[in-house]
Amino acid sequence: MASASYHISNLLEKMTSSGKDFRFMATNDLMTELQKDSIKLDDDSERKVVKMILKLQEDKNGEVQNLAVKCLGPLVSKVKEYQVETIVDTLCTNMLSDKEQLRDISSIGLKTVIGELPPASSGSALAANVCKKITGRLTSAIAKQEDVSVQLEALDIMADMLSRQGGLLVNFHPSILTCLLPQLTSPRLAVRKRTIIALGHLVMSCGNIVFVGLIEHLLSELSKNDSMSTTRTYIQCIAAISRQAGHRIGEYLEKIIPLVVKFCNVDDDELREYCIQAFESFVRRCPKEVYPHVSTIINICLKYLTYDPNYNYDDEDEDENAMDADGGDDDDQGSDDEYSDDGDMSWKVRRAAAKCLDAVVSTRHEMLPEFYKTVSPALISRFKEREENVKADVFHAYLSLLKQTRPVQSWLCDPDAMEQGETPLTMLQSQVPNIVKALHKQMKEKSVKTRQCCFNMLTELVNVLPGALTQHIPVLVPGIIFSLNDESSSSNLKIDALSCLYVILCNHSPQVFHPHVQALVPPVVACVGDPFYKITSEALLVTQQLVKVIRPLDQPSSFDATPYIKDVFTCTIKRLKAADIDQDVKERAISCMGQIICNLGDNLGSDLPNTLQIFLERLKNEITRLTTVKALTLIAGSPLKIDLRPVLGEGVPILASFLRKNQRALKLGTLSALDILIKNYSDSLTAAMIDAVLDELPPLISESDMHVSQMAISFLTTLAKVYPSSLSKISGSILNELIGLVRSPLLQGGALSAMLDFFQALVVTGTNNLGYMDLLRMLTGPVYSQSTALTHKQSYYSIAKCVAALTRACPKEGPAVVGQFIQDVKNSRSTDSIRLLALLSLGEVGHHIDLSGQLELKSVILEAFSSPSEEVKSAASYALGSISVGNLPEYLPFVLQEITSQPKRQYLLLHSLKEIISSASVVGLKPYVENIWALLLKHCECAEEGTRNVVAECLGKLTLIDPETLLPRLKGYLISGSSYARSSVVTAVKFTISDHPQPIDPLLKNCIGDFLKTLEDPDLNVRRVALVTFNSAAHNKPSLIRDLLDTVLPHLYNETKVRKELIREVEMGPFKHTVDDGLDIRKAAFECMYTLLDSCLDRLDIFEFLNHVEDGLKDHYDIKMLTFLMLVRLSTLCPSAVLQRLDRLVEPLRATCTTKVKANSVKQEFEKQDELKRSAMRAVAALLTIPEAEKSPLMSEFQSQISSNPELAAIFESIQKDSSSTNLESMDTS
């Protein structure tokens, strides 16, 4: 430390040197010292350093001065508080100096100090004291109005300080406001402008009294309207406040908007611009409060969008009618540009109107149909706007409209799910001709910006409405070619033109382009040869799509591709051979050439083997291998049967080696390639090649990656069918892995289906030691030997399915095996595991093979219903149902008879019936529907809820068989006097809803409202199941309930409230325990709310929704967890609405995070509280992603509370790490 002090005193001495270079070097060295973490200054050194740095602010040399100012940053954090106050005092005094240079350098110094202070959320006393010291000096400097340059600097620093440390200055806010308000009438516009910026930062952190004072002042001054100049300033100020604190100004809009509307009618273009900008900020920042005024705002914007008093557009309109595909004469281009009037401000009004319409369109999704009636035609008519900047904003507004129209989810464009009448998509479709007509002329404008806007517009239009331009291609192609050929086109314009062409090619049928191929190929080929890699890359993508157009393989085509093959091939091969090109170009050249060979390979002659050799080289390169594998897969699957023999000998072993690489996408791609090669080129593959692949397979068959396993099993199935002799090699490790996977509880879905296909293909190959009985023993052996216990029930189901698959493939073996399984069930010495497997296997076999010849089967299964093991009973129930499907006339009457005569076994028998209804064919079941229906209705009033649920599921699935007859019958039971019956039929409806179109859907849509009326049922349980059914509809088929939301939501929200009358105390020994009978129904209501965010967001009043979310944040553990999830979703979906409610949301979150569990609580309580804290923190992290959320005083206070609490800080940090790693994963496209 002594040496550091000595070194610094040495530097201080040099700073007094008369040589400016010495002073400069010494100051620079001091800067370096101050930036070291290790430096510690004693009191004396601190005083001397501070004094010297302040003295150097007045140095004669500018460079020394600047360095001295930079030293202030690190110095502030290295010296004691009173020294920082000395620095600030001196800088404030110097800021008022007569010397301009000293004033300037002191202002920079103050900004540097403020920038270095710890943030308000850290709770630092230093920051608070320094800011208080500066504030007093600044307010007096601003209020004096003596020297404008001092005022401007002071306002600048004030704004900076309020934005960084506003929360610390709450006590000064009234005096800051008092000094700022008079500056709004300053004769200098620059002063007014900076005052508005400072006020914008003030409103983010000031208390309500100050905020109300400011708004009242602005409203009263606007009402007086003393001078046009100040009125303009006040309107700008209101817009700035709205932008910074929209959530606070909302309640004053009823007073503000009529004034702003009035000023729009004043003949002053600047004022009009500011008024419309204010509307834009209200629309974006106060969505709820502005709602009643949106129509007025739209009308004003539409009026001023065309406001161009000094220019006549009439001649152009006539021009527009003469639209032709050749584009006419280009000599008249740019005539608009010749018109100029420097005093004309009307373009600013038009631009403000376009931006405001953009804001309205982007934020009011529910008004889309209205926008297509009024806003869309108006914007289209303004594509001809003469002022380029305004035109760009008009285009941007229309792009926003298209983006809002893009179907977000499949149900929006699913014809079954469409609401009746005109939809935004059909309205847009009808306006496409007008859009194309308006764009046609713009596409040959000189302006690059305008043409880029046209391409963006066409791209978005085709993404929203694929096929929309089918009739208009002849008109648009010349415009695209114009930009591709234009020497003056910028690179970005060419890229946009190519990208637009690509999207159009992808979304229209090939025939549409055939008349234009001759015109399109040359410019695209020229772009492939462009020296700029981004243009080449985009052009290769277009070329690949053009290849599919000139020779489509999936439909008959009479188009002659021959004239274009040479050009397309030559330009692509040149790029394919080049070694030093960009990675993107390399990959796209490979993909494009793959497409050329796939579609045109029979025309390439001697070029084909040479090109395939290049592919072989690319296969050996780590960077290009995955793209090459995909290209080879495409070629191998071509119906042209391309000759791949020249490369298979070397290529297949390379592909085999990829299966051991630690790159998942490469493994999956390689398995696809090998599969198609085996299917289409089996005669060209040798046993050695196949063995090389088989050697690599065992590690791929594993439960750790089911998708890779599925692909590997599918490959083996193909091999068994095409190359059965190779399977003798799999009896070792591959088969062990397969059998191991069958026992995995994770084997289901696609992987299980692949496994069943494989066993069926394998058993018929007749391979040694892999016959029916061999495989059966391998599959079932462990269960019989009891050597390895199968812990998971799913494993027994998988083995049973495999046994059934083998038996279906070898039906002659069936009777003996079925007989054996029946004996296993009967045998008193059989373990439960053996019985379980035998019953499930009987069920799976009987599902596909009629077992009615097995006379004792019924009695054996019924006997198993009495087993002490629940799993065996359940398996017997499943087996009976599944066997019945194999022969309905034999077994179904028997099951119905048993349900009637065996009340004790009813529950299990109903499960058998459910299996029959779920799995049997509609035709087979039709004759029995009436009998089953009558039986089920007898049991729908059963007091046992489990039985009622099975009955309801049976009723629902039965209704799907004959909806016209049965749905009205279900509806009739809604008026039953039994609440059990009502709950059964409402639950039954849940089982008629699925996520794909069904014949019942239109009928269901007409009557689901009647079922949902049970949300008003007096019985709590009926209301709960109504919510569960509603949730299922909202999740799987939102179109059923979208139009009912206005009626349903009040009842839904009603069920989110805690009901005191449903809370009771239960005595358990010496303890009293509180039971809340309303918890389940509240949970169901909140689950519905969560679902609606995904499926019906545009139909929700988000502020009403948030009211109930707020209540949920204070509810029971389960409900808090749900509402925390909702906050995370809402932060992304409607950030501006959440921002308005932020202060009300923070408190319950803080309460959750700071709750302490009693020391004597059980471990489960601690775990629950920990999970609650983590979920609450996730919600906080999501809220903080909303722009400007951290500016809320309550939120920043909560943040500082989190950072000062080690436990909370650790949780918060880990959550932020998790979310950032998740984002990275989602960006990883491999």
Swiss-Prot record:
Residue numbers bearing the N-acetylalanine modification: 2
Complexes and interactors: Interacts with TBP. Part of a complex that contains CUL1 and RBX1. Interacts with unneddylated cullins: interacts with CUL1, CUL2, CUL3, CUL4A, CUL4B and CUL5. Does not bind neddylated CUL1. Interaction with cullins is abolished in presence of COMMD1, which antagonizes with CAND1 for interacting with cullins. Interacts with ERCC6. Interacts with DCUN1D1, DCUN1D2, DCUN1D3, DCUN1D4 and DCUN1D5; these interactions are bridged by cullins and strongly inhibits the neddylation of cullins.
Entry-linked InterPro entries: ARM-like, ARM-type_fold, CAND1/CAND2, TATA-bd_TIP120
Coiled coil: none
Region (Disordered): 315-343
Pfam families: HEAT_EZ (PF13513), TIP120 (PF08623)
GO cellular component, one term: cullin-RING ubiquitin ligase complex
Residues passing through the membrane, by range: none
Its job: Key assembly factor of SCF (SKP1-CUL1-F-box protein) E3 ubiquitin ligase complexes that promotes the exchange of the substrate-recognition F-box subunit in SCF complexes, thereby playing a key role in the cellular repertoire of SCF complexes. Acts as a F-box protein exchange factor. The exchange activity of CAND1 is coupled with cycles of neddylation conjugation: in the deneddylated state, cullin-binding CAND1 binds CUL1-RBX1, increasing dissociation of the SCF complex and promoting exchange of the F-box protein. Probably plays a similar role in other cullin-RING E3 ubiquitin ligase complexes.
Phosphoserine carried by residues: 335, 558
Keywords, sorted A to Z: Acetylation, Cytoplasm, Nucleus, Phosphoprotein, Repeat, Ubl conjugation pathway
UniProt repeat feature HEAT, residue ranges: 2-39, 44-81, 83-119, 131-165, 171-208, 210-247, 248-282, 289-366, 370-407, 424-467, 471-510, 515-552, 563-602, 606-643, 646-683, 688-725, 729-768, 770-808, 809-845, 852-889, 890-927, 928-960, 961-998, 1002-1039, 1043-1097, 1099-1133, 1140-1189
Species assigned in the record: Pongo abelii
Annotated protein name in UniProt: Cullin-associated NEDD8-dissociated protein 1
UniProt entry tagged with the keyword Phosphoprotein: yes
Cited PANTHER family: TIP120 (PTHR12696)
Entry's localization field: Cytoplasm; Nucleus
Gene3D superfamilies listed in its UniProt record: Leucine-rich Repeat Variant (1.25.10.10)
Domain of life where this protein originates: Eukaryota
Name of encoding gene: CAND1
The family this protein is said to belong to: Belongs to the CAND family.
